[in-house]
Design a protein with these regions (language model features):
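Generic signal for short, ordered secondary-structure residues
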Residues: 6, 24-25
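Short glycine/proline-enriched loop/turn "hinge" motifs that connect secondary-structure elements
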Residues: 17-23
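Glycine-rich beta-alpha-beta "Rossmann" dinucleotide-binding loop(s) and their flanking helix/strand
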Residues: 1-10
């Protein structure tokens, strides 16, 4: 993947709420739960993305980007899967943090609060 002509090493990035990656502007990912219906998380993700885009439009922002301000305490992503193809490539996945909003959760109710009801603007999300 490239941003402004520069190649991006996804494995050096940290997931933000399981929806965006640190320091990559206007880029969203949709991945589901490995322990429940895949679409539960994708539904929350799509509604969060729509809410974020509407917020940006209402404020005149063209860029939204999570920034790792040094508090993510990066670790290898814990997807909860033990398939060989996952384990062989896990070092190429984005990292996750030890706590929110960098922690990848496998819990619908925690994600419901964090994606549907939490404030969009915080000290981790950059807008311009």
């Amino acid at each position: 993947m490239r941003v402004d002509g520069q190649e991006i090493d996804i494995s050096s990035k940290v997931q933000y709420k399981g929806v965006m990656l640190s320091s990559i502007p206007n880029f969203f990912v949709a991945s589901g739960y490995t322990n429940a219906s895949w679409t539960l998380k994708c539904d929350l993700t799509s509604k969060y993305v729509c809410r974020l885009i509407k917020y940006c439009d209402s404020k005149g922002y063209q860029i939204c980007m999570p920034r790792d301000v040094g508090d993510s305490e990066k670790q290898v992503m814990s997807v909860g899967l033990t398939s060989g193809y996952i384990l062989r490539s896990i070092n190429k996945f984005p990292k996750e943090g030890l706590r929110s909003p960098w922690k990848l959760r496998q819990n619908y109710f925690l994600d419901l609060i964090g994606l549907r009801f939490a404030a969009l603007k915080n000290n981790k999300m950059f807008f311009s």
